[in-house]
């Protein structure tokens, strides 16, 4: 019989101790769905002169020519690139990374958000594999409903367009003026990703997270931890009324969760009017967001501390529910958010999913499993 455990999302915890995030490596994902370890060719560099804000930049310009590569990805949330990068790191060290949970930042953000959003707006449907004494978590691919006219929604497109308008593919000294000036006319696409691989932790739980990085704010240091140089880019409606302000506070709270998880220190928001014209740009320090929220909305300010405590609660719960003492044990689980709780259910051998999760490549690649098994062979 399947073992099930529930965790009430309003359960209170006391853990507020966070480990300093540290970047151990990085990789790129191409529009052709290829993964390249230690490749920063997809990394962007932030550059927006003040004068360009007077140009009435259109965040919906070129929407009809948008190239959507994501729809061709077999599995947008695959761990393949993350596992390749961890394996390359372990091959140098000749030992496995000492962490409890390996997943993407987006997965942990969703789990944190379950304490603040309903399942309707924050769907959590994960598959977990216990392998080699570690917990690997992956999101189940969700078939997005395509717009009837096949076009991307303007608010979604405006985010991609903003990134195109405020970044370049090389550091500024190596970028021509022509390239910079042609940014408004450049065709927008998705699928190019630069992912940082970060070791972090909360309480007694150590995590390895993959996190897509929007851009470098200033400069990149070779062979060093570059977390302090990264920036998160977002767009939203201009804040004109108290109602707008409340909506923005909710948005920046979610962005803060994204950034504090992996130690990204800066957030830049582009504010657009109702016609999707970029009106202003504002920079926020990730560390100062809780103070900003507390001064404007005390309840939301407290949510930042509550988010960290809840992060500690659900990771501790997972570690307690999933036995990790014997590295030879392999198990599979599903983790979902429904009503007011997270539900963890063990997937038994009789279920169709079990074989694919344990012996197939739904979560772990055969290459990674073979690598880990080779580490156990006495040299």
Curated annotation (Swiss-Prot):
Keyword Iron in annotation: no
Places the protein is found: Nucleus
Cofactor note: Divalent metal cation.
Keywords: Hydrolase, Metal-binding, mRNA processing, Nuclease, Nucleotide-binding, Nucleus, RNA-binding
Recorded GO MF terms: enzyme regulator activity; metal ion binding; mRNA 5'-diphosphatase activity; nucleotide binding; phosphodiesterase decapping endonuclease activity; RNA binding
E.C. code: 3.6.1.-
Cofactor(s) for this UniProt protein: a divalent metal cation
GO biological process terms on file: cleavage in ITS2 between 5.8S rRNA and LSU-rRNA of tricistronic rRNA transcript (SSU-rRNA, 5.8S rRNA, LSU-rRNA); deadenylation-independent decapping of nuclear-transcribed mRNA; mRNA processing; NAD-cap decapping; nuclear polyadenylation-dependent rRNA catabolic process; positive regulation of termination of RNA polymerase II transcription; termination of RNA polymerase II transcription, poly(A)-coupled
Residues that coordinate or bind substrate: 212, 234, 258
UniProt entry tagged with the keyword Ribonucleoprotein: no
Catalysed reaction equations from the record: a 5'-end NAD(+)-phospho-ribonucleoside in mRNA + H2O = a 5'-end phospho-ribonucleoside in mRNA + NAD(+) + H(+); a 5'-end (N(7)-methyl 5'-triphosphoguanosine)-ribonucleoside-ribonucleotide in mRNA + H2O = a (N(7)-methyl 5'-triphosphoguanosine)-nucleoside + a 5'-end phospho-ribonucleoside in mRNA + H(+); a 5'-end triphospho-ribonucleoside in mRNA + H2O = a 5'-end phospho-ribonucleoside in mRNA + diphosphate + H(+)
One Pfam family per UniProt: RAI1
GO cellular component, one term: Las1 complex
Protein residues bound to a divalent metal cation: 163, 214, 232-233
InterPro entries, per database record: RAI1 (IPR013961), RAI1-like_fam (IPR039039)
Domain of life: Eukaryota
Assembly, per entry: Interacts with RAT1; the interaction is direct, stabilizes RAT1 protein structure and stimulates its exoribonuclease activity. The interaction also stimulates RAI1 pyrophosphohydrolase activity, probably by recruiting it to mRNA substrates.
Function of the protein: Decapping enzyme for NAD-capped RNAs: specifically hydrolyzes the nicotinamide adenine dinucleotide (NAD) cap from a subset of RNAs by removing the entire NAD moiety from the 5'-end of an NAD-capped RNA. The NAD-cap is present at the 5'-end of some RNAs and snoRNAs. In contrast to the canonical 5'-end N7 methylguanosine (m7G) cap, the NAD cap promotes mRNA decay. Also acts as a non-canonical decapping enzyme that removes the entire cap structure of m7G capped or incompletely capped RNAs.
Family, as annotated: Belongs to the DXO/Dom3Z family.
Protein name in UniProt: Decapping nuclease RAI1
């Amino acid at each position: 019989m399947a073992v099930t455990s529930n965790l009430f999302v309003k359960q209170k915890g006391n853990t507020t101790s966070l480990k300093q995030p540290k970047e151990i490596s990085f990789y790129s994902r191409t529009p052709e769905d290829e993964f390249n370890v230690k490749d920063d060719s997809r990394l962007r560099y932030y550059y927006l002169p003040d004068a360009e804000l007077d140009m009435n930049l259109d965040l919906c310009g070129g929407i009809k020519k948008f190239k959507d590569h994501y729809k061709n990805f077999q599995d947008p949330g695959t761990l393949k690139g993350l596992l390749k990068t961890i394996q390359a790191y372990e091959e140098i060290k000749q030992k496995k990374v000492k962490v409890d949970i390996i997943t993407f930042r987006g997965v942990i953000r969703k789990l944190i958000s379950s304490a603040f959003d309903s399942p309707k707006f924050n769907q959590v449907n994960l598959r977990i594999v216990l392998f080699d004494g570690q917990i690997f978590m992956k999101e189940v691919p969700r078939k997005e409903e395509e717009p009837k006219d096949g076009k991307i929604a303007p608010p979604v497109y405006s985010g991609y367009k903003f990134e195109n308008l405020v970044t370049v593919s090389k550091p500024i000294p190596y970028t021509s003026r022509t390239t910079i000036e042609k940014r408004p006319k450049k065709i927008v696409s998705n699928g190019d990703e630069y992912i940082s691989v970060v070791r972090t932790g909360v309480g007694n739980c150590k995590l390895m997270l993959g996190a897509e990085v929007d851009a470098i704010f200033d400069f990149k240091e070779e062979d060093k931890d570059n977390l302090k140089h990264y920036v998160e880019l977002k767009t939203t409606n201009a804040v004109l009324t108290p109602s707008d302000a409340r909506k923005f506070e909710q948005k920046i709270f979610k962005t803060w969760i994204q950034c504090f998880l992996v130690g990204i220190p800066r957030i830049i928001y582009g504010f657009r009017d109702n016609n999707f014209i970029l009106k202003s740009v504002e920079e926020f320090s990730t560390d100062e967001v809780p103070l900003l929220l507390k001064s404007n909305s005390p309840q939301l300010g407290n949510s930042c501390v509550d988010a960290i405590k809840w992060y500690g609660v659900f990771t501790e719960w997972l570690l307690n529910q999933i036995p990790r003492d014997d590295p030879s044990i392999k198990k599979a689980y599903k983790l979902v958010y429904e009503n007011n709780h997270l539900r963890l259910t063990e997937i038994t051998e009789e279920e169709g999913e079990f074989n694919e999760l344990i012996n197939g490549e739904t979560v772990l690649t055969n290459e990674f499993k073979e690598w880990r098994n080779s580490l156990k062979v006495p040299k």
